[in-house]
């Protein structure tokens, strides 16, 4: 039996995946870093900690941090059945995370 966690991506009602589209529009080197980070998340699940993941204050969201020059971030939640739902991906441009990015993830969670 496979003990690894599973990854799901948020999909709109029309079955589009904005997170996967975001990833596909990044350069290959960054995509490879994302694959590596997602592999860590699948392997270690909720026990993965800084510098890879961080709890988003005052929300149910967690932030997966892709270390590198592009500062890529993903907001996700842990669901039952050992599954993570990736809600939103973005490039962090400032020290503090833009509240609009958190809002997008929370709206997608409510839509899910």
Language-model features, listed with the residues they occupy:
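Basic, Lys/Arg-enriched alpha-helical interface segments
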Residues: 1-71, 80-84, 92-112
